[in-house]
């Protein structure tokens, strides 16, 4: 390895370790405290096939820092869905605060492309969005897309927070994010302060079957004055 490559590697490592330290020392930010459900499975999945899967480390997610005053906005807020007659459960379960992974704690939507949408009641600045699709079994959900908007129909404006639909099979544009394995800590998406009243999450089946599931969605932020 030549000198330039060594210097670049050192700079990257320094940034990796110093960024969390800087966040901890920033008086305007605090660690997001989450109540996580009990893990339902242990170990690394071996039978999942995906051409766009992120590297599986098996390590827990590190701390995530948000502006001081950030709070949970989504608890018991109204939920709409592309499938208002779910196969199992009710869409209101998406924001009921219960993140357990067993039977009876998730809503099951029909096959193919589906979405759920949380109405926060007013425009908010968003600092973290978490989703639990189904974590009692290791699986990958396809075409996960997270969007934020002030338009309930998502036809005008809005912000795309996450998109791992690498081949545009959902028709909302190809994304550059990676697919991931569902685990009990859920998936945290960083909206980077995006503003909106509505949060919509898309999926398109999973590696076990063509159905779509949601245990819980949590949205953290602050109302816009």
PLM regions: where:
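Bacterial N-terminal signal peptides that target proteins for export
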Residues: 1-10
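Bacterial N-terminal signal peptides
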Residues: 10-19
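Short linear interaction motifs
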Residues: 54-64
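Contiguous beta-strand segments within globular domains
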Residues: 126-128
């Amino acid at each position: 390895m030549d000198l330039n490559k060594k210097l670049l590697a050192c700079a990257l490592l320094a940034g990796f370790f110093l960024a969390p330290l800087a966040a901890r020392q920033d008086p305007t930010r605090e660690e997001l405290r989450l109540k996580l459900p009990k893990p339902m499975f242990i170990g690394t999945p071996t039978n999942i096939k995906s051409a766009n899967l992120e590297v599986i480390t098996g390590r827990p997610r590190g701390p995530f820092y948000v502006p001081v005053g950030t709070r949970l906005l989504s608890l018991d807020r109204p939920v709409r869905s592309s499938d208002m007659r779910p196969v199992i459960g009710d869409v209101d379960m998406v924001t009921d605060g219960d993140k357990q992974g067993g039977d009876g704690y998730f809503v099951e939507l029909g096959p193919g492309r589906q979405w759920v949408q949380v109405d926060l009641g007013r425009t908010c600045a968003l600092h973290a969005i978490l989703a639990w699709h189904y974590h009692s079994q290791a699986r990958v959900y396809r075409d996960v897309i997270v969007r934020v908007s002030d338009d309930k129909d998502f036809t005008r404006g809005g912000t795309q927070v996450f998109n791992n639909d690498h081949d545009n099979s959902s028709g909302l544009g190809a994304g550059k994010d990676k697919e991931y394995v569902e685990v009990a800590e859920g998936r945290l998406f960083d909206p980077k302060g995006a503003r909106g009243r509505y949060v919509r999450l898309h999926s398109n089946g999973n590696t076990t079957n063509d159905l779509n599931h949601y245990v819980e969605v949590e949205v953290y932020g602050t109302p816009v004055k």
